[in-house]
């Protein structure tokens, strides 16, 4: 795992997403020309350095995760629901990205970018050794690099803080590590799409874009 810093004025993701409290609102912004311009600059200027390559393969647009204050999460992907009960398993959304039904390829590197200072009560946790979960205690302006295919990770189910946590996550690799030959025919789940397999989805011009500096 590595923590990286970025310029929040130059890459003003929080400003662009401010006041957006549902996934639909957030993704509308992320698909906008204004956001895409900032995103592509971030990829070309920052991620190429981190991946040590002038040619990289990166998720076209980031995924959004939202965890409102004083709420339980429905699951690891969706908006949260209001807390109505106690005693739920706080780790029941722990997963590896290689797990069924997502089957992310092993060449992916994960990046997680929260848009607030996070705490032990609203951050992502990573299983650094069996049954040992460590919080990613990042400040605004930092983002985490980790290998999500081999490491269990996820948020606690309940956000007990006063802070609404929005975060971006995205995956990619240096072009030299991108290898379509390892992709298989296993069916995968993609919201709004049908009949997709790993080798049809995790390729350039579908899930990924090719960036060259």
Sequence positions of predicted segments:
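Glycine/small-residue-rich interface belts in oligomeric ring/scaffold proteins
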Residues: 1-13
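Signature of the catalytic double-stranded beta-helix
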Residues: 14-100, 104-106
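A structural signal for short, well-ordered beta-strand segments
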Residues: 62, 111-113, 168-172
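Catalytic core of non-heme Fe(II) oxygenases with the double-stranded beta-helix
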Residues: 77-147, 165
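Catalytic core of Fe(II)/2-oxoglutarate
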Residues: 130-213
């Amino acid at each position: 795992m590595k923590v990286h810093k970025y310029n929040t004025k130059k890459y003003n993701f929080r400003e662009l997403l401010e006041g957006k409290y549902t996934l639909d609102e957030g993704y509308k912004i992320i698909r906008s020309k204004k956001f895409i311009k900032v995103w592509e600059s971030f990829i070309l200027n920052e991620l190429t350095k981190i991946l040590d390559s002038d040619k990289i393969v990166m998720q076209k647009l980031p995924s959004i995760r939202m965890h409102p204050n004083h709420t339980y999460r429905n699951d690891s992907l969706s908006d949260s629901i209001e807390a109505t009960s106690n005693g739920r398993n706080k780790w029941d959304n722990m997963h590896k990205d290689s797990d069924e039904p997502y089957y992310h390829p092993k060449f992916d590197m994960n990046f997680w970018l929260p848009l607030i200072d996070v705490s032990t009560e609203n951050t992502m946790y990573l299983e650094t050794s069996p049954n040992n979960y460590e919080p990613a205690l990042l400040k605004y302006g930092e983002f985490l690099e980790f290998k999500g295919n081999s490491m269990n990770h996820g948020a606690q189910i309940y956000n007990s803080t006063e802070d609404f946590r929005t975060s971006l996550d995205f995956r990619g690799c240096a072009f030299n590590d991108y290898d379509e030959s390892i992709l298989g025919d296993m069916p995968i789940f993609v919201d709004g799409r049908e009949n997709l397999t790993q080798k049809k989805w995790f390729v350039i011009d579908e899930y990924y874009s090719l960036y060259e500096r």
